[in-house]
Amino acid sequence: MTLFRFALAFLVLGLVALAAHPDRPSQAGRVTPAAPMLEPRSSHSATLLPNGQVLIAGGMRRNQDFYRSAELYDPVTGKFRTTGAMNIARVGHTAVLLRSGKVLIAGGWIGHGTTNSAELYDPTTGKFTLTAAMTHRRGHASATLLDNGDVLITGGADHDTPGGINSAEIFHAGSQTFEAIGTMHDARIAQTSTLLRDGRVLIAGGRGDSVNASAELYDPKTKRFIPTGSLLTARYKHTAGLLPDGRVLIAGGSDARDWHGQLSSAEIYDPQTGRFTAAASLHDARFKLPEDAAPIRPGELLIAGGSKQVEVYDARSGKFLVASGQISDVWHFMTETPLRDGRVLLAGGYPDDDHATADTWIYQP
């Protein structure tokens, strides 16, 4: 009888605690520390290669201390090793895996401004080679692989514009050349660019003269930009991800107050209606996020950076869930890369003092 009463009391206490915290976040997956990179990096790029390894390129140790170096993460051994160096040290560049298996690295900051230079990494040789230059200098631009294998590059900052620019161009993978195309309706830096199911690209938010609530669609058939519905909240340095039903999640970022205007709000874009609607909020306000939220299990998107907590958006419940475990600090401009086995590599970033970390973590669903 005594054992029964103890068990009953334990159950009652548990129910009372649950009732007292009805909004306590559920846990989804776990974050654990992993082997460090060879160099501390932030604002670098991380690209999953066809062989399952991850190319980490460029970035910075601290302000004005930029890298040419690159390294490879092997998910089998869990370790990093060196590979060929880029021709130009750069930070805030774009990196896109091409259908050929090569990686296009374009633009970025080079210390005294931005660059229009571009190079290709060949995993079979481990070397970077310079390719044709972009038509415009740009740093912190967006780059999206189109259905035809070409790459759309939009916005970013150049030497002369304090905010973003509105120019755009296409990298033709076959000829390895860049072509200037029509301008966006709004200048943007630190926007998101998401490929939709129908082949169009949603470009949302970013900063021009001010932080944008506007969004537009790029149509590869006409090579034109078309305005669409506006975000509910103007934001930049946010993240975005495609959901299984074809809608797009937009989350976090900041308003014009930057560090003091970090956002926890999220919204969803519906290509059928061309409108944004409010979604559940993140548990933590965060900005300076990876542009693309990492897809994990069907209907789930991982959001890391800007907080010690890692969150998962669950499209079935429409809520953000908190993973167990934490990263070591509030790292900004870190990377998150989905691996072939369903895990996600989280790497680098910098805290408030601008000194990057070499730390990495693995998210296990």
Regions found by a protein language model. Give the residues of each.
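Bacterial N-terminal signal peptides that target proteins for export
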Residues: 1-7
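Bacterial N-terminal signal peptides
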Residues: 7-17
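Kelch-like beta-propeller repeat domains
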Residues: 15-365
